[in-house]
A protein has these predicted regions:
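Catalytic cores and adjacent flexible loops of soluble metabolic enzymes
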Residues: 1-232
Length: 232
């Protein structure tokens, strides 16, 4: 029997209402007012939580010469990776301000750290939930640091093999972590319908014995509707 997990008075697990997290991430582009506006939009839409990213660029980028090409507002943009991440990096006081805004709107504030220092920052904020990035599922020291906090943790599994998910779950539990949620995720943007693979949700639940969520990168609402048949 899977034990429900309590997140700020909201239950996640069998029989509980769907817990909806709105992904803000770094989509505020470093604009604090835009981040506040996105919190309000998420609250007005009925979300339970919003998620940000907290990081220091120097913790995961070692050079400033790498460039990144992406699509923004329908246009292809190429720029320095360092400059892009620095522009979107939120200072501690801004994160604290956003957390207070979430509390006023009855939203769970949570965030994705990229280092142990980022985990400690969220602990100081009194975070009620932590989450990794799929690209950090194989960063076992970070997962152990998250587990050691005792805070409920979401591990996203995009791009991972089953063996890598096994390793991450064992690392979390061996480090004392108890309240674990896994996210079924396909790291394609957008995800083609043929790659959504909702049948992986009951398979993960049976293997790991914990609540399984869905990180959806597909277009439209079809996958969100179809998930009902995958969890019932």
């Amino acid at each position: 029997m899977i034990k429900p997990i309590d997140i700020s008075g909201r239950s996640i697990g069998p029989g509980a209402p769907c817990f909806i997290a709105a992904e803000i991430g770094i989509n505020h582009n470093g604009d604090i007012q835009l981040a506040h506006n996105m919190i309000d939009v998420a609250a007005d839409a009925g979300a339970d939580a919003v998620k940000f990213q907290n990081y220091r660029t120097e913790d995961f980028l070692s050079g400033r010469e790498l460039t990144y090409t992406y699509i923004s507002q329908g246009h292809e943009v190429t720029e320095s990776q360092w400059d892009m991440f620095k522009r979107c990096e939120l200072p501690t006081e801004a994160l604290a301000e956003l957390r207070r805004h979430c509390e006023r709107r009855n939203l769970v504030f949570f965030s994705t750290p990229t280092s142990e220092a980022g985990v400690e920052q969220l602990v100081r904020f009194g975070a009620h939930l932590l989450k990794n990035g799929s690209d950090y599922l194989v960063h076992l020291p970070l997962i152990r640091a998250m587990a050691a906090t005792g805070i409920p943790t979401v591990l996203s599994t995009g791009m991972a093999t089953l063996e890598e998910i096994d390793d991450a779950v064992h690392a979390f539990r061996d480090a004392g972590g108890r309240d674990l949620i896994l996210l079924h995720c396909t790291s394609s943007y957008p995800t083609p319908p043929i790659e959504v693979n909702l049948r992986n949700i009951p398979a993960l639940r049976e293997r790991f014995g914990c609540p399984i969520g869905f990180s959806d990168h597909s277009d439209g609402i079809t996958a969100a509707i179809g998930i009902r048949n995958s969890i019932s």
